[in-house]
Amino acid sequence: MRISFLLHNGYHIGGTIRTTFTLAAELAARHEVEIVSVFRHRDEPILGIPAGVTLRHLVDLRKNSPGFDGEHPDFHRPARVFPRGDGRWKQYSALTDARIGAHLASVEADVVVATRPGLNVQLARQAPRGPVLVGQEHLILEGHSYRLRRDIAHEYALLDAVTTVTEADARAYRALALPGVRIDAVPNSVPAPGVPPADPAAKVVVAAGRLTPVKRYDLLIDAFADVAAARPDWKLRIYGTGDASDNLKKALARQIEQRSLREHVFLMGTAHPMEPEWAKGSLAAVTSRRESFGMTIVEAMRCGLPVVSTDCPHGPGEIIEDGVDGRLVPVDDTAAVSAALLALINDDEGRARAAKAALVASERFDPSRIAARHEEIWNELAAGAAGRSRPRSHGRGRALVHRAVGTALDAGYTAKAKAGVLVRRLRRLV
């Protein structure tokens, strides 16, 4: 089978990139696999090229490269095929529209898999008849803007399948009633770590992820203040950095100082690989308001750490068995987090049992098992292709109505944004 993945930027780092690379490497043992990265901003991918996988790009952002595309006239013209509702829309352009379209028109693959909503929509709009078309959802439907959800409900009907990473999100997609589109929940895969399992006797709690508001590290620090007061021999290590718009490192550092936790809570920055750092702890903590899946939960469990996590939508509750391989607590409940941590901290035997249970339970996320599930879906779709009646375009009337409403919505959003700028300027003058 020839499989082609379409990825936003395979040269960067992130959960979608990591899980795509892991899946591609597993599939490459039996199939011909390529990853097509829309963008390339560096010479070598941060995660390396998966063994047996071909990696190529469509738009070169390297200024020192002879193929630099930043001066192409279409690079500065807005995208019209890639949907405006996707949060990455401003990074796309008329050039990406053309390059992605040309790629899809010529790709020689049995299965084409797009890996973010905007690319899923573009796949539906530009791919010709022939290959099985799969849109992967690595986030959650309810977290998308209204504009993007509207395009999803309209365009995904042209796909063969949509896969989500949780059953809860699969139910949300099924509620869209996309005729003829197969919808399955297939979790992300996490390979077995190349380090020995964590020592349950280690007195370290580990957390990892971007330093952004949704992760609620401020709540975790407050909860750990109670832990440190009761068990001053324990430490909390938080790994990760913020993104360009929401780096909370300074605020968290001030909070640590104000709570007199300098000897107990540490902002560790980014670690790659992360597995050796997980293995230095005996507990993991997740305090997010929402998680599309919960990659760090599985990563921690694969290293032998039970996880205390908020029972937020959607992932944690489908990964952790409460009271067996971790604890689930209410969202935004500082006292519940500290109580759950202390319950495991103060129970050495219980913590060791939970660690063993985490190792066993997390085996279901092994790449071999997850790849086999994807292969099963794709093979069934390919086998039924002859009798499948998937449309390759919408009726002219329906398409015109969708486009007209979309244009009106875009005009409304633009007017609202301009009004907001004007109001802010007037406030500065008053």
Regions inferred by a protein language model and the residue ranges of each:
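Donor nucleotide-sugar binding/catalytic pocket of nucleotide-sugar-dependent glycosyltransferases
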Residues: 135-138, 142, 156-194
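Conserved acidic donor-binding segment of nucleotide-sugar-dependent glycosyltransferases
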Residues: 321-323, 327-334, 343-348
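N-terminal strand-loop element at the rim of the active site
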Residues: 7-13, 31-87, 185
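Conserved donor-binding/catalytic core segment of Leloir-type glycosyltransferases
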Residues: 4, 194, 198-215, 221-224, ...
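Glycosyltransferase donor-sugar binding loop
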Residues: 37-42, 208, 235-251
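Aromatic "clamp/platform" in nucleotide-sugar-dependent glycosyltransferases that forms part
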Residues: 270, 289
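Nucleotide-activated donor-binding/catalytic signature segment of Leloir-type glycosyltransferases, i.e.
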Residues: 249-269
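Short hydrophobic beta-strand element within catalytic cores of glycosyltransferases
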Residues: 306-310
